[in-house]
């Protein structure tokens, strides 16, 4: 897992065009009132910079949660992990992204049936939650890198 710090050469003040009109994912509709505003992507996905970090995903254990190899996850350490949260966990000092299930028996659940759940004792020191995934960034178009 690749750790990417939030602080970078970017100031976080850059904005990109944002068209506030909702776009249908079903049948197309006439373009009505496409108003352009500006959106600061950093302020949208990073609400608490001091407790936020980015990770790049590798592997396919979370594909049914639409988290794919190469995606970037935005993780907030200050968010309280709850039943059903997608979390970053350390198991015996190895990191993974999984869904946290607390009932009926605590486990880290992969979102791919090819992988088994990872059951654990909540009082165990071998499992530590390192944060809750708040956003994921997926690249859709092929772009030259």
Residue ranges and their predicted role:
Residues 1-63, 83, 94-95, 102, ...:
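Short, positionally conserved secondary-structure boundary motifs
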Residues 57, 75-76, 98, 110:
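Thr-Gly-centered strand-to-loop micro-motif
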Residues 79-80, 114:
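Short beta->alpha connector loops
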Residues 93-124:
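Aromatic- and Lys/Arg-enriched surface recognition patch
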Residues 70-71, 85:
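Structural motif
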């Amino acid at each position: 897992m690749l750790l990417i710090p939030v602080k970078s050469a970017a100031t976080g003040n850059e904005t990109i065009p944002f068209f506030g009109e909702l776009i249908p994912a079903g049948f197309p509709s006439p373009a009505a009132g496409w108003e352009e505003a500006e959106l600061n992507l950093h302020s949208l996905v990073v609400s608490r910079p001091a407790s936020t970090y980015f990770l790049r995903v590798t592997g396919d254990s979370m594909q049914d949660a639409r988290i794919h190899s190469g995606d970037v996850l935005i993780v907030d350490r200050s968010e309280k992990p709850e039943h059903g949260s997608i979390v970053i966990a350390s198991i015996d000092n190895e990191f993974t992204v999984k869904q946290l299930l607390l009932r009926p028996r605590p486990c880290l659940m992969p979102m791919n049936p090819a992988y088994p759940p990872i059951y654990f004792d909540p009082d165990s020191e071998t499992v530590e939650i390192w944060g809750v995934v708040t956003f994921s960034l997926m690249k859709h178009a092929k772009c030259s890198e």
